[in-house]
């Protein structure tokens, strides 16, 4: 592997966090920082990176590994997270993911009052208004849980801290953050990678794990290709206030030709949404005044597609005219029998954002001394809501492979030890990405023949208990 040099800002004063946590020490540039050795260095402290660190720490076989958790962001600040306005970055957790969090001791630290379980999903075709209902049996486990990503990070981080504080031995996990990697280069012997940083000197590791997202530094260093394509679609997200619920929490998804629109419940009459649409429409929606945007969002769950298509073509620089059209069309549609989300009353100021959507999957998950997981290895459309769950399943599989290697005296950084992880996850993720891609393309079609077949398919699906049970199992337990 060739070395990868990244620009970073050097600091005169270099803070480090002691293993006992909460105690900050400072080393000055004049002091010599010795090269430090790790068994594993995880790059990225999002939910996937933190889950991997927590999982390694709680597994009786892997807890002896010396682990470094490195991130350019100071994720340590989240241990004192103040619970304020809901974040617009949320994830749907399967029961399988929830049980993994419970197994590693993180679920106890999650703020349950900010997590919304739900047992019902209603999905509809935006052209024909045909729909399917997915409902868990009364008394069964929730179908899924909606949570802010920051709540998951808070729970994982505090579970790690709790274990470190209660470990009578010297803790084997070190937080290396905030920390910028300036260079990655090939090491010697079993310490395969040298990591040059701005604040923690030079580190060496047997295994470097990239949990650092779609723009992964680790993936680029390892020269692992990630084939894929852009969807020419942007996802608009935000946090909502809604009319008080009069029944159980329900997730709604409407498949429009411009892209799917999802409404996902949060506690205390809050909700989040993911509105996948064409880039020029997303840009126009972001510029709308908040009041008009809320009307447009309500309308997008209620109006027929020809009405929405007309509205998309309006000049959004004149919100008053858009408001007039929305008010009139919603009034006409008021007595519709369509099942729709509760009325959205406002969008939390500053919560609107948009990002491009892409499908991509790496050719390799592992190389000598390298492993990738989560978004560093695969990106997909959010329409199925399984992005984080597939990342957590990567984490479980990787921990299992490392545990097996340690038990059998193998080198944890060798390709031989890492191949079981690749074999387990690549095909499953590839199938999932392919299904989501085909589903997205199917519902983007406006051909009358295709829409007729879709309507028939949805009708048959809605009447098939076996098909529903299969989908419910996937939603609840992941891929």
From Swiss-Prot:
Pathway: Cofactor biosynthesis; ubiquinone biosynthesis. Keywords: FAD, Flavoprotein, Membrane, Mitochondrion, Mitochondrion inner membrane, Monooxygenase, Oxidoreductase, Ubiquinone biosynthesis. It is found in: Mitochondrion inner membrane. It is an enzyme of class 1 (oxidoreductase). One of its GO terms (biological process) is ubiquinone biosynthetic process. Its main location: mitochondrion. Belongs to the UbiH/COQ6 family. This is Ubiquinone biosynthesis monooxygenase COQ6, mitochondrial. It comes from Schizosaccharomyces pombe (strain 972 / ATCC 24843) (Fission yeast). The gene is coq6.
